[in-house]
Amino acid sequence: MKLSEAVGKRVENLLAERNMTQYQLYKNGGIPRSTISVTVDGKYKTVKLDTIYQIVATLGITLKEFFDDTLFDDVEDWGIIEGVIRY
């Protein structure tokens, strides 16, 4: 599985666990709606760490908790995480 697909599925699963919509994530976290949509759909070629950080902060979990999921066990392209956390 590609990293972008695993990230998208993980965000989708976390939203479902919290009975939360992409719109609520946008409203609560200030993350652009288009960014959330493209992230959940796994359409990014690269995954921005800043984006993942904003999402996990809004959901109230850590980056470690986000990536500690079996979805990431078979990720093939870990090298495409882009960016530095600025928080």
What function would you assign to each model-found segment?
Residues R10, T21, K48-T51, T62:
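Residues that mark the N-terminal boundary/hinge immediately upstream of a DNA-recognition element
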Residues L15, Y26, V56:
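The alpha-helix within a helix-turn-helix
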Residues N19-V38:
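Short alpha-helical DNA-recognition segment
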Residues V38, G42, Q54, F72:
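Alpha-helical DNA-recognition elements
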